[in-house]
Each structure stands twice: as C-alpha cells, then as structure tokens.
Amino acid sequence: MERVLKTNKGEEVSPNEAVFPILTGDIKTKEFTFVATGFFINPLGGFITAKHVMFDDNEQPINPFFAIQTSKGKTYLRRLEHFVYHSVADIAIGMLSDVIIKKNKLIKVPIETLYFQLSKNAPNIKDEIKTFAYPESTIIPDGKEQIGAFNGVWQNGIIEEFYPNGTGAFLKSPCYQTSVLILGGASGGPILHKGKVIGINSTAFKQLEGETPLSFFTPITEILDMSVIIGRNKRKTVKELISEGKILFN
C-alpha cells in the first residue's frame, strides 16, 4: 500500500508529518495518556479531529491537550491554543500554540507544518478509501519518565453506505459506513480518497474474527458551516478562510 502522502505543496512525505497523536497529561510529573489522532489543515498549526475525543468521560474538555508533531525528522510537543466544535457533527477544529515544551520549559519556535488539501467532492459507494492514524500507540513508564511509542498505521477499505441523517444517538449528522478497520485511538484521523481528505474517522463496531470491519466517518464538508477562533477571540467562518487560501478546499 502507498506509504507516502501528497501535501498542500504536492510533496510526497511520510504521513506522520501531517498526522499526529493526541495526548493529555502533566509535563511536570511527565505522566501522559494517549488519546486519539488529529491532522493538519493549514500551515500555522490548524488541525481537525473528531469532536468526541476532545472531551473526557465527564463531558469536560480535555485539559491539558498536547500534540506530538514530527517535522523534518524532529519531534515537538505542542500545546492546544484553542478549539471549536460542530454543534451536531463529530468534528472539532483546533489551533496548536507555536510554543513547544522542551525539558519542562516553554519555548517559542516557528515550526513548518505540512497539511492536507480537503475535498468538496462527495465520494461514491464502493469508492476505495484509506486512513492513517495512531491506534497502536503506547506510553510506558521508565523510572521517573515515560517512553512513548507512537506507531502510525495504514488501513484501507471501501465506502458501503451513506446516511444523510446520521445513524442514531451517536452520529446525528451525515456520515458514511465503511469497511475500514478503525481501532481505538484512530478516531480523529483523516479519511483519504485520491490524495485528499474527504472525512474524519468517527467510530467503529467490534466484529467477530473473520468478519468485515464496520466503521463510520463524518464527511469533511460538515466544517463548511463552522466558524473558528482567529487571534484574540476573533472569529472567521471556514468559508472565509477557504476564500483567503488559508484552508485548501477544492
């Protein structure tokens, strides 16, 4: 299977340049927990993930929130600056801070961010799709520290059904059923078709051994009626950002 991605610049890169694992934890105690996956949609650290991964079991926003970003062979721990979420769809849009965490200190460092083009074209039933996410990730205690093993995994499948009104209590907005194997931790990862993002991993059902995987994703077009925070509590619509070329959506 293809192991590289084409980014906004048309460059072929390792997928972990544009897709990242999400953590929560404490930088002082160095105790972290792996949560899910996210992916970049603009060069400044704007990203998308699934809405449900941004909240804990008590329906409170995850705090603190960290992203492990890889850029040009180096790894950075970046904090969340802010995020917004769709009122119905399982989508959240966030911005990472340009301050990284290094040896328990906060350092402002400009980081080049490779990001995806988004597709406005609705896929068809039986279209082949794939995802790259971090379900096989672990954080292992090692004395006074922890060692993170973040292993990105490709999965592919086909689109099997479209539900314009959602599937029920969990997915109340338009969604697609697929045969992509979505494991725990892959929520929030990108669904790709012909090199562009068409959706976000949302949920999956456990199947018996040998059965075809059953999973669902939210179409990326659901972000078009959202607005995001820009600067100091200013807001712009996603459509405005697209028209300004700050999000590539075609």
Residue ranges and their predicted role:
Residues 15-31, 103-113, 142-236:
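Active-site region of chymotrypsin-like
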Residues 1-37, 47-50, 89-92:
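N-terminal activation segment of mature serine protease catalytic domains
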Residues 41-42, 123, 192:
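Short, well-ordered loop/turn sites that connect or cap secondary structure elements
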Residues 83-86, 227-250:
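Cysteine/selenocysteine-centered motifs that mediate thiol-based redox chemistry or coordinate metal-sulfur cofactors
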